Amino acid sequence: MRLLPLLVGFSTLLNCSYTQNCSKTTCLPNAKCEVHNGVEACFCSQGYSGNGVTICEDIDECSESSVCGDHAVCENVNGGFSCFCREGYQTATGKSQFTPNDGSYCQDIDECSESSVCGDHAVCENVNGGFSCFCREGYQTATGKSQFTPNDGSYCQESMNSNCHLEHACIAANINKTLKRIGPITEQTTLLQEIYRNSEAELSLMDIVTYIEILTESSSLLGHPNSTTSYKDAHFNSTLTEFGETINNFVERSTHKMWDQLPTNHRRLHLTKLMHTAELVTLQIAQNTQKNSQFDMNSTDLALKVFAFDSTHMKHAHPHMNVDGGYVKISPRRKAAHGTTGNVVVAFLCYKSIGPLLSSSDNFLLDTQNDNSEGKEKVISSVISASISSNPPTLYELEKITFTLSHVKLSDKHRTQCAFWNYSVDAMNNGSWSTEGCELTHSNDTHTSCRCSHLTHFAILMSSTSSIGIKDYNILTRITQLGIIISLICLAICIFTFWFFSEIQSTRTTIHKNLCCSLFLAELVFLIGININTNKLVCSIIAGLLHYFFLAAFAWMCIEGIHLYLIVVGVIYNKGFLHKNFYIFGYLSPAVVVGFSASLGYRYYGTTKVCWLSTENNFIWSFIGPACLIILVNLLAFGVIIYKVFRHTAGLKPEVSCYENIRSCARGALALLFLLGTTWIFGVLHVVHASVVTAYLFTVSNAFQGMFIFLFLCVLSRKIQEEYYRLFKNVPCCFGCLR
């Protein structure tokens, strides 16, 4: 009984908040009746406002402009509203209709993610709420416009002015247009994705040139992350991969037909810019890594490898790269720095098919099919790049770089060389192959090994003008060195003989003496300085000295021929007058030729290969021309002398058989061949038609010319034998040999 009041009170409390259907009150259709504390009342449904009895008006939620958020349209309906994304936008779930209370919002649709959205020969540019299509250079729509949207039925077709890409003004205009279009992009990843996406499709010549310029102009942005923090491993790898694939798109084999349309100097300019930018950006990206790392990427026509390490790991780091059957390795001067801390980045790039683009031929597509093209140097290997960036710069200094590269094709009949692409950052249009600072250590038919003292882009060159194989070339080099050393010794003995033996002094020995002096100096300078090509000024001076001394030697050979002719024919001459003119002709005329040549083309003295005259603009003929003239004169004199001597010998000694006369004349003729320099005719033949036979004949006969002169003028001369006998007769070790 005591609990009854509590139950009654609790029941009353429940009735105050209990709602039930109305029985007396009538509400509008958009309202509902509810009972509260025993009182009936009408309430408008959600989305309506009013008293529920006489009025229930729809609430216009769309009157608040921001109710659906950005890039959305609000649509009011009875009792509510719906949000619709504008064209070009959608929610994260891919829907176009939503209500904001579920957390959805509209974001831009990247229509350009579908590569074919604009059709062939077009580039897609994504913008907020849509996209635009641009025809590539050389193409336009039927209306002549370059910009369009595909839903209007437009597409890109070849322009009537499709040769515009060959004009500098057209190239510059397209570059400026593209720079203006992507100029607002200030984020590294976005810019890289934009360039990569546009390089994926089939590229025209204008596309290649334009985006190489974009890469060059944007190298500072591409090489640095979007914030001050370092790269995470995943971001570092993905960024380098995407950058490497972008470079690969510009140099892959399918683009070679486009590159062929550019003149050689323009082709080299843009390739130099591309290689320089690739090297620079790769180093910059790698400098922002968080820790010691290594990265590898291998695409169809480009391979990339990066080493990043700090000073504590230097002694364990061995930067190297295996490339297409080859190998490249960097050796630093020191592998550990005492008390110095810092970071080091080493980057290798291998361009697998870029070689033909950098060959000396104007039409490399045809040249690659012709192994016998004259006057060309062809790249027969991959082109590799090696670069170092250390902080501080002295932390990791280069001692040498060694590499072995496989040949693209066999080169058993050609000479190979180690070369690097020599260019200046301020003058990239002057890029060319050079051998300075590089040394060939080994070569066979399939591979060549090199050692260089600097870093840049390296390759193996094949000289297609040479018909001499590597083995023959090495043998000829050794023969030349040995022959010149022996000749120098023999010429020194000849000079001593003709200078100090008073009993044999005559006009003839004076000529012999000057010939031997000129030839001795020429061969000495050749032996010491022919390969000193590291310093252009020194190399030019050596080339000038060689030019003068060899011409002087030829001049005295000519004097030998003229003097012998005068003796044989029996012309009476004034010795004093003749001596004076001999010296003028022997030493002054070569000086005039060299001085005149130097005034016209001093830059042609010394080449990147050897310190000799350049073949450019036929400058080599400033030596070959006078030499050929002297050889011709001496050949005529040689013929007359042999004829006169043979007839004279046969007339004086009729009892001597014809065979003996011929034998005597043959021995004299052989002596004259070397004395008059007529053996140089083999050199002329080798220039006209190079062959292994002419190479060996020229090398042996002229490298040993000093030895032959010593044999015929000294050893086989009775007068000089007597002088040697008198000189050495009191020397016990020599007397027995001279008896």
Curated annotation (Swiss-Prot):
Residues 20-481, 535-548, 603-622, 689-695 are extracellular. Glycans are attached at N21, N176, N226, N237, N298, N422, N430, N444. InterPro entries: EGF-like_Ca-bd_dom (IPR001881), EGF-like_dom (IPR000742), EGF-type_Asp/Asn_hydroxyl_site (IPR000152), EGF_Ca-bd_CS (IPR018097), GAIN_B (IPR057244), GAIN_dom_N (IPR032471), GAIN_dom_sf (IPR046338), GPCR_2-like_7TM (IPR017981). Its main location: membrane. The record marks L455, T456 as: Cleavage. The keyword Ribonucleoprotein does not apply. Residues 293-468 form the GAIN-B domain. The keyword Signal applies. It comes from the Eukaryota. The chain crosses the membrane at residues 482-502, 514-534, 549-569, 582-602, 623-643, 668-688, 696-716. GO terms for biological process: cell surface receptor signaling pathway; positive regulation of synapse assembly. It is a multi-pass membrane protein. Disruption phenotype: No visible phenotype but deficient mice present increased cardiac hypertrophy in response to pressure overload. It is found in: Cell membrane. Residues 1-19 form the signal peptide. Residues 20-57, 58-107, 108-157 form the EGF-like domain. Belongs to the G-protein coupled receptor 2 family. Adhesion G-protein coupled receptor (ADGR) subfamily. Endothelial orphan receptor that acts as a key regulator of angiogenesis. Heterodimer of 2 chains generated by proteolytic processing; the large extracellular N-terminal fragment and the membrane-bound C-terminal fragment predominantly remain associated and non-covalently linked. The transmembrane domain is not required for cleavage, but it is required for dimer formation. This is Adhesion G protein-coupled receptor L4. The gene is Adgrl4.
